[in-house]
Amino acid sequence: MQKEISRRRTFAIISHPDAGKTTLTEKMLLYGGAVQLAGSVRSRKNQRATTSDWMELERKRGISVSSTVLQFDYQGYQINLLDTPGHKDFSEDTYRVLTAVDAVVMVLDAAKGIEAQTQKLFEVCRQRGVPIFTFINKCDRPSKGAIELLDEIESVLQLKPFPVNWPIGDGADFKGVFERLAKQVHLFERTTGGAYMAPVEVGDILDDFVKERVPGETLAKITEELEMLDIAGAEFDSDEILAGRTTPVFFGSAMNNFGVELILKGFLHHAPPPQGRPSAGKFIEPSDEQFSGFIFKIQANMDPKHRDRIAYIRICSGKFERDMMVYHSRTGKKVRLASSHRLFGKERETVNEAFPGDIIGLVGHADFGIGDTLSTDKTTNFHEIPRFTPESFSYLHNSDTGKFKQFRQGLEQLLQEGAIQCLSLKGSTVAVPVLAAVGPLQFDVVQFRLESEYNAVSRLEPAPWQVMRWLPAEFSEEEMDKLSPPTGSRFGWDSERNPVLLFASDWAASYFEQNSAGLNLSRVPPNQKES
């Protein structure tokens, strides 16, 4: 089993929207041999869409709205690659993915450097001590200087950058990269639409083909920069990389396949295999005999013909075997894992065995929820996955009374994914769902999917609240009646029947907290610690 563990690499790709995250994902699949022809997020109708953006809404909008698992073998490695949504409204899904990986590839736009969402996701990685590999993308467009980008990584993220390779030229004159550890030049040629692997010439910086294709002043400039890096730059230290204090930096252009193979190979060589995890007072090593794993994502309706739901489980220890019996931590019951699948975007195939680091899909278990532990050892219970505090609220009206059954069934299944909550309001006599989410785009996703997947048309109506706080767990309706929150506030319960109080503004929430001595209002549910 140790051999299987050591060849696993489980990682996510993160970035600010439009930095090229999903494009890099697709090109890694191309170079990894998992696809023969790479699609593009911004592809025209007669071209292929990306493998990871399989949902109809993603294809229409050209953005990722849900994380995707892609598994493939490459040069002896078993790769579990997770593409994540970039937009902040989907950050809760991305955060859950980051609990399930052992390393991260951070994509930066060479023209923009570190952007807001990148910084937020980086902080999550830092808290978890996850190693970070950096790909500076779009070097074939007008961009910041390479040294400026390294300085930005160090000053903004407090992360020591080690450039594994160095760009030769920039913008329209970007020719390739110099690989510092191997001391080799890689010069690329463009392919039509970037759909195929880019032809590349590899050799010494003094070779004739380099002098023919790269202007003398460009060669002189990078020679000077490389000397400066050797004198002043950080050393390549594997321990510092694995500790998350140093980030290897790769330059390239995902759209044109420049440098993609180099980061794929570099990452696989230097990234860690599956790591151990804390669980209820003990530490679970991947090599432990007892099987264990946790559910970090639920996807409803992946197969519209069967209206099924898939629970994504990260295997942490032991060997998974189809039909095995395990304990379900939240219910204490024993369950049989009969329908298990290997995942590749929307595609799936039955898997009979899997090992630590693998992500597999389990079908047919309505009781499974996000954060649940499954294990052959009843005492194993991994830390719960935190929920984000909702900041957007909306009523969701069913537009067709004749389709109420489809509307209700669809909403119930989409709620199980955990991206949105359905609130119950105290004293409400109208059966209109009140949705709560991290951002308003989540509501658009629900509305679109209800119509496209369940044939249920709905209408969104903005709700008048901006802030939600949790009351103590046992807070009763009688106790609610004794309070006088600001005008526009509303008492209610979240999807797990925890009492909440909704406010029209941050000011109203702060005012009420300051004038309610002894009342403990929380930004997280009662069973979750505030970070």
Regions picked out by a protein language model, each given a short descriptive name:
Residues 1-531:
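Structural and coupling elements of P-loop NTPases
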